[in-house]
Amino acid sequence: MFSIPPSVRRLVFLFLIAAPLLSIVLPVAAAPAGVDPPSKLQPRAPQPSRRMGATKRSKKIEPLKKKDYSSFLCPGGSVACPIPGDEVSPSSVEALEKSLNSLADWFKVGFECVELETELNSCGGCLALGSGQDCALIENARTTGCENGSCQVYSCFDGYVVSPDRTSCVKRGSTIPATPVTAVNVEEFVADDQLPFGQ
């Protein structure tokens, strides 16, 4: 037969004596005014159960974004631009974009590291990917540069003047020319922090 150790018997005896005394000393908290306490415990209201294997709400699947490999291929501030094999056209740009899916693809095609804010031949974007401009190809421009990602014309060939917005050359007399950058007015540019050629 099973016997209870004396220490456990003493604890049970103390509990049986102490429980009624505690209920007298610590009365049950009164219910808030105007609310009747329930006389019996009430069962929960029935609810439908979930079926096992019920379908979950489908999550929105976002299309995968192409990874930018420039940080792996070029030092800070530079962007990797693919080197085009042929003439750049909308179809060649599309084909090139589809073919550049991994680092290995970039090495197969070939690339150069370009600072798009200042690069004369790829100003503001990669020409092979259909963006940017080659500032050296501006018609009738003698000297050009790339400032803040946009081409700037500094001087034009004879018969042409720099346009007021400094992005092209126009026939002399067809418009008011831009103020030329000379040694006389360089001080104005220095005051405005607008020196050409990064001087």
UniProtKB/Swiss-Prot annotation:
Knockout consequences: Intranasal infection of C57BL/6J mice with knockout fungi severely impairs Arg1 mRNA expression in lung interstitial macrophages, causes a modest reduction in lung eosinophil recruitment while levels of Il4-dependent IgG1 class switching and cytokine production in CD4(+) T-cell are not affected. Causes a decrease in type 2 inflammation and in fungal burden in the lung and the brain resulting in mouse survival. Abolishes Il4-independent and Il4-dependent Arg1 expression in mouse bone marrow-derived macrophages (mBMDCs).
The keyword Signal belongs to this UniProt entry's keyword annotation: yes
Name of the protein: Protein CPL1
Xref: PANTHER family: APPLE DOMAIN-CONTAINING PROTEIN, PROTEIN, PUTATIVE-RELATED
Induction statement: Induced at 37 degrees Celsius in culture medium for mammalian cells.
Function (record text): Virulence factor which promotes fungal virulence by enhancing type 2 inflammation in the mouse host. Likely binds mouse Tlr4 independently of Ly96/Md2 and activates Tlr4 signaling to drive Stat3 phosphorylation in interstitial macrophages, which promotes the initial induction of Arg1/arginase-1 and increases macrophage sensitivity to Il4 signaling.
Family annotation (InterPro entries): CPL1-like, PriA/CPL1_fungi
Keyword Transferase among UniProt keywords: no
Signal sequence residues: 1-30
GO annotations of cellular component type: extracellular region
Location relative to the cell: Secreted
Source taxon at top rank: Eukaryota
Glycosylation sites: N148
Stretches for region Disordered: 34-58
